[in-house]
Amino acid sequence: MKEDSPPTVCVTGAAGFIGSWLVMRLLERGYIVRATVRNPGDMKKVKHLLELPKAETNLTLWKADLTQEGSFDEAIEGCHGVFHVATPMDFESKDPENEIIKPTIEGILSIIRSCAKAKTVKKLVYTSSAGTVNVQETQLPVYDESHWSDLDFIYSKKMTAWMYFVSKTLAEKAAMEAAKENNIDFVSIIPPLVVGPFINPTFPPSLITALSLINGAESHYSIIKQGQYVHLDDLCECHIFLYENPEAKGRYICSKQDATIHQLARMIKQKWPEYHVPTQFAGIDEELPTVSFSSKKLIDMGFKFKYDLEDMFKGAIDSCKEKGFLPYSTNEVKKGLFESSINGNVHGQKGNQKIGDEGVKLVN
């Protein structure tokens, strides 16, 4: 998408893990960025955006809320493109239908209506989730964009994060139809577990899972049992790549590498021996096969991944150490951020409650 003047784009959930890195990369390329956050006046949550290179001239903050119809109208008006990153997340919700599922679906539909009103938006890029693809009773060896999670299975089992899987699946399907009806080019990007360095001030929820072998979050082992991973920077570059490619439409898996929990444990043990990671896992077969997410469609478009699994974890661990979010050795882990965040003692957060994609509170 070549423009005579720098194109203007809107990024939702801009203060979070994915959103803030995406804003940084867009600014570097000369884009005029309208970043939506729930409270632009809360400097603790937006300072890292305002301090980015080119922010003074190319970045503006806009107040918007997924739960309020028309909330994004002003931010989107006049934009060439929209990157919808924000999503409600609250795995402990007592009313997931009304607090998670409906707001997620209505949020993306409201944004599409805002895009239609603007009449200038050429493409909407939506950050979906691996949870829309492979949540089913039996795992396949390889997944691609044609696969969808089994909603009946999810509702019957109601496993951890079930409402998130349902909300993202239904939202993506609804968005595809609504974008088509409104003649808006729609791209959905399906990332697996996102790992890497970060600039947002809070501890990214996805890293609680990714670093669970270090921080002792055993309840997250089921997620990394047969995991797939992508570097945060590769994911954000993918967003821009598909936005700028006029041929890009539909779903795109953005996954660089897969690994079983055993393979991940061996890598961490070798590269970061200061952390005592477990080597055996009750109920998990040592010969566990990997489950792959195929990025063939994306790669065939010309996209190139830059980072491998070791790069991802080095970036994440280094950032966590620098920000004081991760102890420097196993002996300090129980005093670290993970335990504090679960107890609600860090940045006013309470565990994973009401944290957006990734790290923005979206629901009161």
From Swiss-Prot:
Superkingdom: Eukaryota
Record's keyword annotation contains NADP? yes
One Pfam family, short name please? Epimerase
What InterPro entries does the record tag this protein with? Epimerase_deHydtase, NAD(P)-bd_dom_sf, NAD(P)_dehydrat-like
Q: Which reaction does it catalyse?
A: a (2R,3S,4S)-leucoanthocyanidin + NADP(+) = a (2R,3R)-dihydroflavonol + NADPH + H(+); (2S)-flavan-4-ol + NADP(+) = (2S)-flavanone + NADPH + H(+)
Q: Which SUPFAM superfamilies match?
A: NAD(P)-binding Rossmann-fold domains (SSF51735)
Q: Which UniProt keywords apply?
A: Flavonoid biosynthesis, NADP, Oxidoreductase
Binding-site list for NADP(+)? 45, 164
Which pathway features in its UniProt record?
Answer: Pigment biosynthesis; anthocyanin biosynthesis
Identify a single GO molecular function assigned to this protein.
dihydrokaempferol 4-reductase activity
Enzyme Commission code(s) on record: 1.1.1.219, 1.1.1.234
Into which EC class is this enzyme placed? Answer: oxidoreductase
Q: Which GO terms describe its biological process?
A: anthocyanin-containing compound biosynthetic process
The protein's job, in short, is: Bifunctional enzyme involved in flavonoid metabolism.
Give the family from UniProt.
Belongs to the NAD(P)-dependent epimerase/dehydratase family. Dihydroflavonol-4-reductase subfamily.
Q: What is this protein called?
A: Dihydroflavonol 4-reductase
- Lineage, opening ranks: Eukaryota, Viridiplantae, Streptophyta, Embryophyta, Tracheophyta
State the encoding gene: F
